[in-house]
Amino acid sequence: MNPSADAPGAEDPAPTGAGEVIPGSFIVVFKPDAADPPGLADQLVREHGGRVDFAYSSALKGFAGELPEAAVEALKHNPNVAYVEPDMTVQLFGGGTQPAPPAPWGLDRVDQRTLPLSASYTWGASGAGVSVYIIDTGIRNTHVDFGGRAVWDFNAVKGNDPDTDCHGHGTHVAGTVGGTTYGVAKGVSLHAVKVLDCTGRGRWSWLIAGIDWVTAHAAKPAVANMSLGGEYNQAGNDAVAGSVASGITYSIAAGNSSTDACTFSPASTPDALTVGATTKVDAQASYSNFGPCVDLYAPGTFILSAFNRSDTDAVYLSGTSMATPHVAGAAALYLETHPAASPTEVGAAIFGAATQNVLTGVPAGSPNLLLFVGDSATVPSAPPAVCEPSKPWSKNCK
């Protein structure tokens, strides 16, 4: 596999999470006790006008579609409706093919406590029997690094967007989760859930449709990876929370804006593992978001993985998008040996096993924790070194 080296300069991941409102498009979230969400959505549109694009029943209850302003105002006062939000754009949190040293240093780093790197990656578990859902641009399932373990599941992108990864980001992320060469968990089953188009952009309504599909159809034990996001969005956060409540562990990118991750979604979801990015010298990456909504860090700069241009393609990318699948892979390793573990228990194991206080440039209020998979098969006997009360596994803090 020949990694590409034809790209922008170092630490130049894709755009920040600033979102744009989609004119006339809205997300309507029902109250938890609402019955028959698809039927209710159709009824409300018949009464008030508009069009239903997606009906949500599993991660949350509600629908997304085009609505006239009068309908929006009426729905805000409907007793079945919790809230209405404008649909907005979202995007991936990594990109740009980049030159880098010829080694998958991210894998090398997460199996040892300290530098220097050992030029090897040692693993015990492989994630066999665990399903990882890549909620992204899709996956090039035929890539040799997946060894037939990648399948296509769902496409939420509206229009004529094909059931393929026409961007490359999702294939790269999947490779870091579970590629034979580039992956943390080399035996997982990889599932493509497409919510971003060929440009790497999408809408919250598409993301929620993907989350809703995973919640309804996941083969457990299951992990979901979301190397994407946008400005704070309550419906997006609620969808992730509902999916986690169903038993699926979520690994989510903190974002690439060098600011507080709590202002982004779904990074600000308390129920998920939110991941910041580091460099090869154990520094917080200059682009990485930070703050109390970040749970831990993982390698994210100059990460080599599979790409979509051929079945043997590989490139280097940077971003919190690249850090996040390291954690998703670690979750899969844990679930192989603890298949009945809840997302809270998976989070506690990863959080507690992380290497403490080796990172530089981590702002106050952010956890100085680096992913470590050497203890991935063992529930940590000690409580986490950093306790964040908003996180569900904070009960492990003493």
Q: Which ranges hold each PLM region?
A:
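Short, surface-exposed ligand-recognition loops at beta-strand->loop->(often short) alpha-helix junctions
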Residues: 29-37
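N-terminal domain-start motif of subtilase-like serine proteases
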Residues: 8-20, 66-73, 96-134, 154-166, ...
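Autoinhibitory propeptides
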Residues: 12-16, 42-106
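The feature captures the short pre-catalytic strand/loop hairpin that immediately precedes
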Residues: 279, 300-326, 357
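Structural recognition of the beta-strand scaffold that forms the well-ordered cores
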Residues: 26-29, 64, 83-85, 131-135, ...
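Ser/Thr-rich, Pro/Gly/Ala-heavy low-complexity intrinsically disordered linkers and tails
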Residues: 2-8
